[in-house]
Regions:
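Hydrophobic faces of well-ordered beta-strands that scaffold small-molecule active sites
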Residues: 1-7, 28-30, 55-59, 86-90, ...
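Glycine-rich, proline-tolerant flexible connector loops at the mouths of alpha/beta enzymes
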Residues: 27-50, 62, 94, 179-180, ...
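Active-site mouth loops of central-metabolism enzymes
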Residues: 1-11, 61-69, 149-160, 214-217, ...
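Acidic (Asp/Glu)-rich catalytic clusters
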Residues: 18-22, 44-55, 75-86, 169-170, ...
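N-terminal beta1-alpha1-beta2 module of alpha/beta enzyme domains
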Residues: 1-58, 153
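Alpha-helix-loop-beta-strand connector modules within alpha/beta enzyme cores
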Residues: 41-58, 113-116, 120, 348-354
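An alpha-helical appendage that flanks or caps ligand/catalytic pockets
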Residues: 103, 107-144, 190-323
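Conserved, mostly hydrophobic/aromatic
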Residues: 24, 47, 78, 117, ...
Length: 354
């Protein structure tokens, strides 16, 4: 099993990525959330020149953020700096689009986007639609080797629902899933494996990535300690961010625990007060997956963190991740919270025992 990190992209994310490489992590994924974080391709370029072996990927790229030919060029340019170390995770856009008041990209549009990007990277001549015009495009001078089209760039789709899983299976990409617990994530992997069977593929060939958000607790440390709240709290309240917008947007499909419903009701009251009223998303996604906002602090309880994140002692987390590995996940990715970069050492120490 590959052990990797995911970072909330900063222009200097290369520093934590370099440290992760030194500690034995094999991949680093970078957020593509333009209203909250730095550009992933800028950060990945810096990481490419400061590291030697760690694999670098978009985690995950959102199609509407760039034209498909631009994305193909960005990936190939990075591939020149770090040959064979570049990966493309892609999704329909949760945070990146919600932060601008938009819903997810349509799956058919994402499939077309992937077709164009992959075709260009294979040096094919591609039919491409833009602004109602159909054009034939290709890279014009790959022989000059300004970019690297020789080394393959693997693709992964972040998929929570059945249609997204079916698309990943049809295209034969890797699959990225957000982990809350081993039991829940193993069940989702089984659904994904069945999608591969239905697509005529061998489930054993599926490369499944489990992305986990949480905190490695010291023995006796409570789930709502200041450190645990800072590291795991943003991942827990993210579920409330998603569900609070359920009337306007399709949700990720996470279920809020029935016995914790009073916490969500309290959050909905907070959400109702956000201004401007026509753009509540400007508040609800502020600091999203990076920090707790002051009004969220009382809601990030020990039980919420315990139930909605991958938080626990070393022994507990080792058992959870072994269960993911034994079920067929090929990679576990730990979210390194912005401003808490020492998490990379804490997760490395815990993962060393697996």
């Amino acid at each position: 099993m590959d052990f990797v990190i995911t970072v909330a992209t900063a222009a200097d994310s290369w520093k934590v990525v370099k440290r992760a490489e030194e500690l034995g992590f094999t991949y680093a994924w970078f957020y593509d959330t333009q209203m909250l974080n730095a550009d992933p391709f800028v950060a990945m370029a810096a990481a490419a020149v400061h590291t030697r072996t760690i694999q670098l990927g978009t985690g995950v790229l959102v199609p509407s953020n760039r034209l498909a030919p631009v994305t193909a060029n960005c990936l190939a340019s990075l591939n020149k700096l770090a040959p064979g170390r570049i990966h493309c995770g892609i999704g329909t856009g949760f945070t990146a689009r919600r932060a601008m008041g938009l819903g997810a990209v349509k799956l058919d549009d994402m499939a077309e986007y992937i077709r164009v990007v992959q075709g260009l990277l294979r040096q094919e001549m591609i039919e491409w639609d833009y602004a109602g015009q159909r054009r034939t495009i290709r890279f014009l001078n790959p022989e000059l080797e300004l970019i690297n089209l020789a080394d393959a760039i693997p693709f992964y789709i972040s998929a929570f629902g059945p249609r997204g899983k079916a698309l990943a299976a049809r295209l034969g990409t890797g699959w990225i899933y957000g982990v809350r617990s081993a039991a829940q994530s193993v069940a989702q992997l089984q659904v994904m494996q069945q999608a591969w069977r239905e697509a005529g593929r061998d489930p054993g060939a599926l490369y499944a990535v489990a992305q986990g958000s949480g905190c490695v607790l010291a023995d006796g440390e409570p789930y709502d300690s200041p450190r645990a709240k800072a590291q795991a709290g943003p991942g827990a309240v993210m579920v409330m961010h998603d569900l609070a917008e359920a009337e306007e947007r399709r949700t990720l499909g996470y279920r809020f625990p029935d016995d914790l419903q009073p916490l969500f009701e309290a959050f909905k009251e907070i959400y109702a007060q956000y201004t401007p009223s026509h753009a509540k998303y400007l508040q609800v996604h502020r600091w999203h997956l990076m920090r707790l906002r002051p009004e969220e602090e009382p809601l990030a309880t020990a039980e919420l963190i315990k139930r909605l994140t991958l938080t626990g002692t070393k022994q507990h987390l080792q058992e959870e991740i072994r269960a993911l590995r034994d079920a067929g996940y090929a990679q576990f990715a730990a979210h390194i919270r912005y401003g808490h970069e020492t998490m990379v050492e804490e997760w490395a120490e815990m993962l060393a025992g697996i």
